[in-house]
Amino acid sequence: MGEKGCESCREWQEHCYREHMDVSRIRFFRLMTGDFAHGISIPEKVADRFSGQITKGFNLKAPSGETWRVSVEKVADELILMSGWEDFAKAHELQENDLLFFTCNGRCNGSFSFDVLIFDASGCEKVSCFFIGKKNSIGGQTQNAEQYHLSDSEDTSTPSTFLVGSPHKASTSKKLNGKTKTNPRKEPEDPNSSRSHVKHEMIEEEKSDDDDEHADYEHADYYYSRFANYLTGEEREEIFSLVSLQPGNPVFVTVLQAPQIHRKGLLIVPSGFAADHLDSRSQEILLMRPNKKEKWYVKYYHASTTRGFNCQRWIKFIRENRLREGYICIFELMKGARRVTMTVHVIGKVDDRFVLLG
């Protein structure tokens, strides 16, 4: 009797789920195994629940906030995410045993939309996926952003782990006497919220840029990260006296912090430098060291609110060059190179004096 009752309950639950539950509450996950790079199947129960309503495909909203259109095709009684999925998988660098969690959030442009969370084999969210976007995203606007889908002009929150070494923000960027200045747009915010706390730090950073009495006004194409802005005029003069820069090459200076050299760290490129000298898209950048033959191809991520290096190849560059917290790095953009190339000059401190490190 008990077993029959349980079976009846299960049938009733299945009926409620299939016939009465709002589809916007449907969730499912997929483990990336087999030939996942070219397409993945939708669980049978989920496919049945939509009852032919997803023939137009899905809109997948990635952790970065970008939306991807993916078509759905029926193959051997299975619904498979096909056209558009390969681009999604490639852009997010999906690997074997990555796990994707899909949550339906209603319709968008006539198609169902799903929020997608992406986890790696360790069970943690893949940080790089917050910085992945696509070109020609939904809505007809060209998007090359591969970071958080925020706008510099909005001056909204940025994860605190990315604030260390945070750059000038290109809210309204303009050059004053050769120095990039920014005018962030301020909006009311709850002073007790974490967003307000982060924003306060970012605004303070802007103040440090604007009020820097030691600003190097002589060089229009020199940019400084948040912590590099604390360098005095004498320190800057001493640092640049140690390196040989080609005339006309723009540079940005950063002081390495612990989070930037962690295995999942992010080195932010000053937004003024990015806006003035780099294409508004994610791309590979070649890093070189002076007087060395080695080359490092590092992924540069570009988005509305954050731009920087964040990948295993960046970590490899750190390790192979034995970079440490507190080191000063001068990234020199090599004008005239066939591909985007930066020479990285590294400076440390020994006995309270700056020294150029090989």
Swiss-Prot record:
Entry superkingdom: Eukaryota
Keyword Isomerase attached: no
Compartments reported by the entry: Nucleus
A Pfam family: B3
Protein name as catalogued: B3 domain-containing protein Os12g0592300
Coiled-coil spans in chain: none
Ranges of biased composition (kind: Acidic residues): 203-215
Region (Disordered), start-end ranges: 148-215
Family annotation (SUPFAM superfamilies): DNA-binding pseudobarrel domain
Bias-annotated ranges (Polar residues): 156-181
DNA-binding residues: 25-122, 252-350
CDD domains: B3_DNA
Molecular-function GO term, any one: DNA binding
SMART domains membership: B3
